[in-house]
């Protein structure tokens, strides 16, 4: 799954992080996204060699209220291989990720709530149908807000994974706000696992700086192989990312985001008919991303 990036339901749950102070709540968020990564040498891919690079473009539409959210994402990944790895069973073509995620919350009182979490995704290589690239996730969580500075959500999701079937995945999102100008989030979902630190540079929260370190995963269904049968690829990465979000006017409608990332670790595991048959890693790589969006 993307984000990616990022697991989309987490973007929806964390939508309030984009709310500028002194601006009425706006339930809709529309984002255009672009990202590029440098091409780097692959290793641990004997007997083949070469380079791998990736770029991404897409859009995201979120509807969010304090007790419910729905997030739709479309991303197109261009995967570029060079050298002898190109055309081997350790390479694949361009991929597409369509995802619908969301949550619904029921409040017990001001401190305790329960949530249902859901995700539908089609993640597939060119030449593979939407239905064959389909998978899903469903689960529940409990939310505890002991004070104004602390917000903890803990649960479990059943996730259909191309490479491993259906697995129970822990879900954790813990946010601590020590002051109006700072926020720390610990996130563990199986798809995104790590720490995010946010700093607000202005009193109206119109300018935000993010620093994050994550272990993130992507999984795509690949075209069948005449030798191995069904195929999938699971990508695990550890990006260190710093970004800036800037609202462009006092109404809090239009904003831009930019980020730089250094990916210390990236590993591609290929599953053929349920068994891991190939792996490669890339040297440390860097990348840029840019987003523009509006709230209304």
List where the protein language model places each region.
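Transmembrane beta-strands of outer-membrane beta-barrel pores
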Residues: 34-40, 65-67, 74-80, 120-126, ...
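Residues that define the transmembrane beta-barrel architecture of outer-membrane proteins
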Residues: 51-57, 92-98, 130-138, 166-170, ...
